[in-house]
Amino acid sequence: MDSNTVSSFQDILMRMSKMQLGSSSEDLNGMITQFESLKLYRDSLGEAVMRMGDLHSLQIRNGKWREQLSQKFEEIRWLIEEVRHRLKTTENSFEQITFMQALQLLLEVEQEIRTFSFQLI
């Protein structure tokens, strides 16, 4: 995994955790949790691709990986929509920058997961 992507995830998660969005802080915590889950999933797919010998055991052991992949894409789409909504509603420049970077990172991660999944098929 690219070290820039790791630091981008860490940076965005740290900045999002510092935000105070009033009554929607519960929603923000949910977004942070999903970001962390997405990062772990992307990392595990990347590791599976790097260890192609494990590919077949991964597919045999986990026959539901395509279903999980589909679920992750749904989560990414939900996060993208949520981040876009936050961008439209916030006037705070710190939040705007954070959510713009989060959106860019989500799009990059979506592409990486697609690339990994095509290699696994």
Curated annotation (Swiss-Prot):
This is Nuclear export protein. Disulfide bonds: none annotated. Keywords: Host nucleus, Host-virus interaction, Transport, Virion. The keyword Transport applies. Interacts with protein M1. May interact with host nucleoporin RAB/HRB and exportin XPO1/CRM1. One of its GO terms (cellular component) is host cell nucleus. It is found in: Virion; Host nucleus. One of its GO terms (biological process) is exit of virus from host cell nucleus through nuclear pore. Coiled coil: none annotated. Average number present in a viral particle is estimated to be 130-200 molecules. Signal peptide: none annotated. It comes from Influenza A virus (strain A/Chicken/Hong Kong/715.5/2001 H5N1 genotype E). A motif (Nuclear export signal) lies at residues 12-21, 85-94. Gene3D superfamilies: 1.10.287.230, S15/NS1, RNA-binding (1.10.287.10). Belongs to the influenza viruses NEP family. It comes from the Viruses. Mediates the nuclear export of encapsidated genomic RNAs (ribonucleoproteins, RNPs). Acts as an adapter between viral RNPs complexes and the nuclear export machinery of the cell. Possesses no intrinsic RNA-binding activity, but includes a C-terminal M1-binding domain. This domain is believed to allow recognition of RNPs bound to the protein M1.
